Amino acid sequence: MSAIADTLRSLDIKAPPVATPTGRLVAVQGLLLESVGCRLHTGQRCRVETVDGSWLDAQVVGFRDKVTYLMPFKQADGLVTGARVLPSTGPSSIQIGPSWMGRMVNGLGEPIDGRGKLGGDRTLSTTPPKVNPLRKAPVEEPLDVGVRAINSMLTIGKGQRVGLMAGSGVGKSVLLGTITRQTVADVIVVGLIGERNREVREFIEKSLGPEGLKRAVVVVAPADESPLMRVMATEMCHSIAAHFRDRGQNVLLLCDSLTRYAMALREVALSLGEPPATRGYPPSVFSNMPQLVESAGNGEGSKGSMSAIYTVLAEGDDQQDPVVDSARAILDGHIVLTRELAERGHYPAIDVSQSISRCMAQVVSPEHTLAARKLKAAIAKHARVRDLIPLGAYQPGADPETDRAVKLHPHIEEFLCQGTREDAPFAPSVDGLKAMMS
């Protein structure tokens, strides 16, 4: 027997190669590719062969019986019936580290700024991590965003999630740029989701600038990207922000916009045959939004913070839009920008009477809270008689509080207005509020 074994060893017989499971493409319908013959799980990445021999990256988004539904990351061109479908052999995680600071990536974590490859000593999951709600650190410290109206009247805490809600052309992106430049934070993660290509470059060069970019990571998925890439880019910026938070740093996440993330989810869900519900949004959209938002916030114990600000587009200035309504319910506050204030040249066009910060009372002093309430009350009293003043129908002396509100109104307007390049630190903003309402 030993002689036979020696003879077999001398022949150097190798095991046959393991066959790679291969499927084939059977249909293309809109955004969906249909594949059979290869067992793939949901969320798995795969490659589809094109007519010229190149490969198109896609992801499994569903299945029915023996048919697997794929959605490509890029535009699906050059596909033919019977094309090979192979499971992706690359890693589903990404290496991240300090080298990511000042870089711009897409929804797959690939650099798009032409400055070479990215790497690091930690593994970044493409899915935002979940934190046990009982272990999340509470919101206890104010976050200085450099905007007087927010610092004084709608104070945001470190670890809070807030929405900037407004119609188109009211100044959401401009205000977001001001917050980006002036917020006191260690790291800023910016997600530009569904934006016009022109606005992406303008935001990076003008709003962020060279100094702001040094402490920022920008995730880009413009409007011409596939809906799957827009969804993945939104989740990617949350994963990046959570990574730096868990390293003990104070992180500000800016996502522009949550509405376009919901629209991308709608495109994916409708392609899979999910029935439309409220204004064409399938039910799964409103179950995915809370999962995304809850991945933001503070981490466990005494680790760093992750504050998040989302822009929310109110279609037709409708504050009862389903995405706006859902965001208002799941966020820790909302800042409403109105077209009326914008048309009057009031920048930022923040309507403090319609806005609220749910964490403000626990991060500021009682004196600060009282002064903010007095200013809101003065705005409300002035609003009741605003139409009477130009007509000469308002008669002073009937109500001393209303008289004081009318007298204070020009000073309140001046206090709440701010130039796009003007910095308004937290302490001077609060001192100005207290002095005006004393």
What name fits each language-model region?
Residues 7-11, 88, 145-150, 237, ...:
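Phosphate-interacting basic helix/loop segments used at nucleotide- and nucleic-acid interfaces
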